[in-house]
């Protein structure tokens, strides 16, 4: 409202010429949107950031540690906290509160045909299946990056980043024709708890009588489950590249489910994790992030997301642009980088240097605590070149005027065959 805008605009204008430290958080207009677990997480050391009004746990302070940011262009005061969270996800099990996800229900007798027209992937799947897809514009650019879960013959749940919810709702509503379809923002009705890591199945079996085996609950499916003394819908997907489930829980049962997971988690080393860890894990796995690595100006094929595009399914927005790009060839590729020196950091917008020449910028960066160095993604021009041509070059990333040698890969450096998510 106007009171929110008055506070926030006064701060943003004042920051225009200030030092834009990495991870700098706004101080005004805070606490407007909170998860049902906000006070639970606060009591356990959460240090919050804000996106789209949502208070989200960015990292968790240790007992006796100050619960605030100390900004720097080098390693900030939460670096070791993130490392512990990151390695817990890679080697044990972590719990993320992702209630800030945007959740959109699309239903009606024309819901399937509507989504087939807007989404690049195949939407005609069995109820219970989860589809990773993009919504494209006429140029093949990415308007939205989302998962779609088919709940029934006529109902679908779209899960989008919290920061893009209003944009995605507008795009959907803009493209409704003379169709019987209802589009509803259902975000306030459910919280999302993400149980992620190789010990995720062990934890889930302690709190639920349901079967979480690969046979009963394979990757890319959603199941209704009992958990503690409550109910949830468990989606077997991941944004960190590990075995895990996103638990969609009615907001009135969220605290109970959290407490059940926390109590059972003591036996398996459960660790609460924040958004900074989510980000570092997803960049290790080379998962794209909308607004950084993929935007409406980035072609879906050049972003390396062709596996989620099905031109043979029939017409959809952007199909002609996809076919044209496929026939013409890619003019650039999204590449993953890891610095050879473990000390420097990558944040965003650092120059990519190929064979001594600046050719692009880093779209997103963080520290790969498992890979052992700073990691990032960025586009590299590759007109008429093969994958081998691109990877045969020498790459450096320019950081504060110094060029640091970097390893480059077109596949995820962490678990390139995606075996861990299907453990």
Per-region residue spans from a language model:
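Glycine/proline-enriched, intrinsically flexible loops and inter-domain linkers
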Residues: 1-423
């Amino acid at each position: 409202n106007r009171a929110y805008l008055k506070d926030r605009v006064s701060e943003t204008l004042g920051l225009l010429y200030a030092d834009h430290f990495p991870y700098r958080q706004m101080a005004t207009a805070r606490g407007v949107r909170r998860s049902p677990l906000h006070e639970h997480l606060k009591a356990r050391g959460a240090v919050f950031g804000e996106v789209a009004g949502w208070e989200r746990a960015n990292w968790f302070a240790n007992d006796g540690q100050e619960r605030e940011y100390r900004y720097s262009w080098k390693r900030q005061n939460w670096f070791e906290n993130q490392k512990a969270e990151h390695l817990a996800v890679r080697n044990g099990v972590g719990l993320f509160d992702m209630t800030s996800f945007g959740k959109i229900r699309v239903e009606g007798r024309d819901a399937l045909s509507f989504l087939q027209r807007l989404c690049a992937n195949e939407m005609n799947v069995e109820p219970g299946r989860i589809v990773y897809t993009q919504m494209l514009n006429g140029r093949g650019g990415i308007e939205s990056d989302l998962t779609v879960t088919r709940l029934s013959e006529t109902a679908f749940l779209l899960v989008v980043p919290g920061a893009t919810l209003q944009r995605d709702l507008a795009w959907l509503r803009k493209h409704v024709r003379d169709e019987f379809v209802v589009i509803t923002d259902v975000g306030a009705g459910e919280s999302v708890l993400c149980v992620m890591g190789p010990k995720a199945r062990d934890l889930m079996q302690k709190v639920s009588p349901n079967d979480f085996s690969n046979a009963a609950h394979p990757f890319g499916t959603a199941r209704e489950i009992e958990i503690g003394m409550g109910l949830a819908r468990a989606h077997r997907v991941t944004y960190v590249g590990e075995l895990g489930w996103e638990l969609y829980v009615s907001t009135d049962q969220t605290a109970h489910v959290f407490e059940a997971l926390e109590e059972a988690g003591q036996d398996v080393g459960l660790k609460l994790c924040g958004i900074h860890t989510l980000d570092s894990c997803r960049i290790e796995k080379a998962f794209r992030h909308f607004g950084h690595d993929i935007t409406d100006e980035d072609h879906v094929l050049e972003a390396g997301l062709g596996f989620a595009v099905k031109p043979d399914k029939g017409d959809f927005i952007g199909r002609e642009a996809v076919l044209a790009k496929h026939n013409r060839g890619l003019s650039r590729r999204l590449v993953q980088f890891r610095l050879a020196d473990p000390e420097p950091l990558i944040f965003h917008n650092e120059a990519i240097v190929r064979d001594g020449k600046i050719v692009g910028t880093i779209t997103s960066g963080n520290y790969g605590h498992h890979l052992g160095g700073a990691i990032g993604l960025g586009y590299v021009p590759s007109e008429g070149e093969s994958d081998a041509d691109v990877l045969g070059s020498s790459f450096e990333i320019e950081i504060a005027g110094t060029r640091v040698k970097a390893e480059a890969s077109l596949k995820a450096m962490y678990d390139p065959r995606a075996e861990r998510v299907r453990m």
